[in-house]
Amino acid sequence: SRSMQFGSAGYTKSNYASTLAATLACFLMKQGDAVGLTTFGEKLEEHIPARNRPGHLRRLLTELEKPAVPGGTSLEVPVRQLADMLTKRGLIVFISDLLAPIETLDRQLGWLGAMGHDVVLFQVMDRAEIDFIFDKAAQFLDMESGDAWFVDPDQARDGYIRKFNAHREAARSSCE
């Protein structure tokens, strides 16, 4: 999603997510597991079926190096498309900032769990988003919608952190 392109320290959330996915793929393949990769935005973009054979890791890493598809993200359609392709139960790992409506997250994760899959979520956030470390009034851009707001961080900080932490806790609860 567009929000994954944010990064306050020269490294975006998307970069971190790709590095995490590559690390998990290497680790899992070394222990003999088959690994696949699915990327999506509004719809499924790329799906590489799970395998563990020579050359497969290179294919996964090549896909992870590609820039993210511009546009928003929706869980509804891509998760259904993915579920239709999965013929065996397995471990599904989502790597995202999880800046999506909690109801959608609950519904999709619950649905995959009901199908017998184990689902793991990795939430990738930037330190500036977590601590709201901004100190000057500025224009903030919603990376998903493109809407812009002028915000005084001193006035917004407490409310933002409270809402952010509530959302993060609700996302964590979706995994239980």
Locate predicted features.
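Von Willebrand factor type A / integrin I
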Residues: D84-G90, I102-E176
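A short, mixed-charge helix-start or loop-turn motif at secondary-structure junctions
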Residues: S3-G7, L64, P153, R157
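Short, electropositive alpha-helical surface patch
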Residues: H47-T62, E176
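Alpha-helix initiation and N-capping motif
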Residues: P54-L57, G72, R157, R168
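Short, surface-exposed alpha-helical recognition segments that flank or form part
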Residues: T12, P70-T73, G159-R162
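Von Willebrand factor
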Residues: H56-G90, I102-E103, M125-D126
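An amphipathic, basic-hydrophobic helix/alpha-beta surface used to engage anionic
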Residues: S1-R51, L91-S96, P101-W111, I130
